[in-house]
């Protein structure tokens, strides 16, 4: 073995070590950059979730609702359902707000379980909810009947039973001027059902 070949081998080893160190450093940099991108993406998704989610029920909130209805197309087929808990004020006054919260959360769960496959549930006020269904509108009658059964079968720890008034509108019922006319019509139908509930149940409505 000559001295030149020995230097040559040492030079090769040194070159390999340099390349190896470079690759390790490059991999570390790429891993760091990827981790940072993933963390930023997670933080953005977390902020988006918080900004669009109702804290009590984990349904979509009013902010998400406003964004959704502003993107609905009147030329497409969908259903707008306005929903409102009955007797919530009476429950809060007589059993406490923990019982009222139990009702609100139970209502939200029943809505998600019944409508979650077909659309989204929004809590837009204290006991006010909206469901927007964009799929399987032809099966709506069986879906709403299933929802009514689910509500009727519910029993809580603080409250024995729950009733919910609703009113719905198909976007295809007629030509609407805007989305808010549909929302208004659904609200009016819901309030008619609510008045009927109080008349038939003989319960004095608290305002």
Where is each model-derived feature located?
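Short, hydrophobic beta-strand elements of compact beta-sandwich sensory domains
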Residues: 1-9
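Signal-transducing coiled-coil linker helices
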Residues: 12-55, 63-73
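Conserved nucleotide-binding and Mg2+-coordinating catalytic segments in signaling enzymes
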Residues: 45-67, 83-97, 105
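Hydrophobic framework residues that shape the active-site pocket
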Residues: 88, 106-107, 129, 166
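Catalytic-core segments of nucleotide cyclases and related cyclic-nucleotide turnover enzymes
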Residues: 97, 141-148, 152, 156, ...
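Active-site-proximal alpha-helical element of nucleotidyl cyclase-like catalytic domains
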Residues: 99-118
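Short helix/loop segment flanking the catalytic signature motif in cyclic-nucleotide metabolism enzymes
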Residues: 103, 130-147
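A short pre-motif secondary-structure segment
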Residues: 120-123, 160
